[in-house]
């Protein structure tokens, strides 16, 4: 029940032509939807609504994914979002944390996985250190407490793309481009 009826019909038409394919029974959503054919990815008005972009081969689909990424469009492929969930959560959590909110210990540990030891936090306070793993999972931690007790070396006023130094530059630029176009990064 993932696809609208018109898209489901097109998918059924395609898969019925695949020789040796095991039949799979599945049904469409109740909505009708619409199927449009475009010769080029850039002919698609991506800024209007949600799109399911299909390609004849995985190679073409990979090229489309790379093109979408280079332009800052958020997408999912094979059920995986183009911005990994843990990365997205770390960005959102840093934004909350830097505004003075407290975070549960597990979210602080996730933040530390995107920081570099020795420059962003004191060595020995890594996300898998005995000390971090011994924190009560219900404990709420603020940035000032993390600086005092968890070896945090970063300024709480830093933007996420400066603070989360383990996120590679390409991914940071991709996410920043998506945010500029007001795309939902999740």
Put a short name on every predicted segment:
Residues 1-186:
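The feature marks helicase ATPase cores and/or their adjacent C-terminal helical subdomains
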């Amino acid at each position: 029940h993932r696809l609208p009826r018109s898209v489901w019909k097109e998918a059924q038409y395609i898969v019925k032509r695949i020789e040796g394919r095991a039949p799979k029974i599945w049904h469409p959503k109740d909505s009708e939807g619409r199927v449009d054919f475009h010769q080029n990815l850039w002919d698609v008005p991506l800024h209007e609504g949600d799109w399911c972009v299909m390609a004849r081969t995985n190679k073409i689909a990979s090229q489309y994914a790379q093109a979408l990424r280079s332009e800052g469009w958020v997408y999912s492929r094979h059920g995986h979002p183009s911005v990994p969930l843990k990365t997205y959560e770390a960005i959102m959590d840093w934004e909350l944390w830097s505004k003075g909110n407290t975070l549960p210990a597990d979210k602080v540990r996730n933040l530390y996985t995107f920081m570099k030891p020795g420059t962003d936090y004191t060595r020995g306070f890594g996300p898998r250190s005995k000390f971090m793993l011994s924190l009560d999972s219900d404990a709420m931690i603020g940035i000032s407490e993390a600086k005092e007790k968890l070896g945090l070396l970063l300024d709480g006023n830093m933007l996420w793309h400066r603070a989360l130094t383990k996120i590679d530059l390409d991914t940071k630029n991709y996410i920043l481009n998506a945010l500029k176009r007001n795309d939902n990064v999740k």
